[in-house]
């Protein structure tokens, strides 16, 4: 199997731009794709802010080395508004677009026709079954179609889940493990099950925290403090929910409830969360969630 050196990332949002950044830092040639100049510009901005942070830490006090590092990483990144053109030489295609199965399936059906035969296709979905997305491609591609699930903030979080469907070949799985290690992350593998490993455990825990609040058993602040100081979490469940996005949290659990593959008690909705989402309070990105960030 060919080494992964050329990567195309579809989606320039928080996750997509983070994946572009870590691949470019690992010296891969990366094309970042989105549908508008504004979306690509936003992705570039996220990368340059994060790169400055990484450079400052790597070359503390040496501005020249910091600049050389940033320039070298940025030189590995190309922007494109055409996914079809951008995959023409890709060893790996990673999709990080909206969590909509039809949109993802249409994208991959189109890319399957134009990408090189050896290209590995991956989705960074956190909530949709990989095999349902992969089924939109040819049988040959399904052997090269896996989940590659990064965590937010991508440049800082050290884990990648490689989600292996029954169709994925050993060679492809090995290539993805090698790529994950090359970009400085630790891979774990799991079957194509709801939430994979991290979200399967993390999301029900967070929802129970929301329901503790619904039942007025403890305050947001006290639950967060308890989990940080009593369980060693870097963020409490409400801080983390605001960080991930309340709409995302709701989308994941509503999807699981509909699928019916998870114990119903674990996917009980939370009134506090539902109310905030319906009022447009989605967490940090909208300025308010469980906490108010405008103050
Ligand atoms: N770019 C580059 N580096 C970053 C960064 C960024 N955007 N954000 C943080 N970092 C680095 C910092 O430079 C620092 O590095 P160091 O330890 O080597 O010095 C390290 O990360 C810690 O950052 P800070 O000291 O500035 O801040 P904190 O100690 O408060 O850490 C945090 C910030 C890493 C976000 C930490 O609070 C954390 O780990 N929170 C939990 C995040 C989490 O659980 N993410 C997973 C969410 S679930 C998910 O993504 C799945 C999805 O499918 C829903």
Predicted regions and their residues:
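Rossmann-like NAD(P)-binding element
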Residues: 38, 53-60, 65-121, 128
């Amino acid at each position: 199997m060919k080494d992964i050196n050329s990567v195309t990332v579809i989606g320039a949002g928080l996750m997509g731009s983070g994946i572009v950044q870590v691949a470019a830092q690992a010296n891969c040639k990366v094309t970042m794709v989105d549908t508008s100049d504004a979306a690509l510009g936003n992705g570039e901005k996220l990368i340059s802010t994060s790169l400055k942070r990484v450079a400052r830490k790597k070359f503390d006090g040496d501005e020249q080395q910091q600049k050389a590092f940033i320039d070298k990483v940025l030189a590995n990144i190309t922007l494109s508004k055409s996914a079809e053109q951008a995959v023409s030489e890709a060893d790996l295609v990673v999709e990080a677009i909206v969590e909509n199965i039809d949109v993802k399936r249409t994208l991959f059906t189109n890319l399957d026709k134009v990408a090189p035969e050896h290209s590995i296709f991956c989705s960074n979905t956190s909530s949709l079954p990989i095999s349902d997305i992969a089924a939109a491609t040819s049988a040959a591609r399904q052997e090269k179609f896996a989940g590659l699930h990064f965590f937010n903030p991508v440049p800082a979080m050290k884990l990648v889940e490689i989600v292996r469907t029954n169709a994925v070949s050993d060679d492809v799985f090995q290539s993805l493990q090698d790529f994950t290690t090359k970009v400085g992350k630790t891979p774990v593998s799991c079957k194509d099950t709801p939430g994979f490993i991290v979200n399967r455990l993390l999301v029900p825990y967070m929802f129970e925290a929301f329901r503790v609040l619904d039942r007025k058993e403890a305050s947001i602040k006290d639950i967060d403090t308890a989990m940080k100081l009593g369980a060693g979490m870097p963020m409490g469940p409400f801080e983390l929910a605001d960080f991930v996005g309340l709409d995302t949290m709701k989308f994941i659990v509503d999807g699981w409830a509909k699928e019916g593959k998870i114990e119903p008690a674990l996917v009980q909705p939370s009134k506090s969360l539902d109310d905030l989402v319906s009022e447009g309070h989605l967490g940090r990105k909208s300025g308010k969630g469980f906490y108010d960030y405008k103050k």
